Amino acid sequence: MKLIDAGYGNRVSADRIVAVIGADSAPAKRLIAAAKEKFTAIDATCGKKTKTVIVMDSGHIVMSAKEPESIAAAENK
């Protein structure tokens, strides 16, 4: 099982990632709001600005302060 660094010592399983998207778009913000309502949002930002939303196959979303490009590059290694 390969783990991807989500920032600040947090890791997510690369096998379970469905999508890595930027957090600035309106659809991403709606996705975050819906996940918070359903209690499926995981905040891995440690209080920093959310830059990336990682969608997992379980329906959870992980919010990260790392850039989407760096997470996608780590996933492709």
Name each model feature, range by range:
Residues 24-33:
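Short acidic, Gly/Pro-enriched loop/turn segments at secondary-structure junctions
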Residues 52-77:
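C-terminal structural segments of small proteins and small subunits
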Residues 1-11:
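Short aromatic-glycine motifs in intrinsically disordered, low-complexity regions
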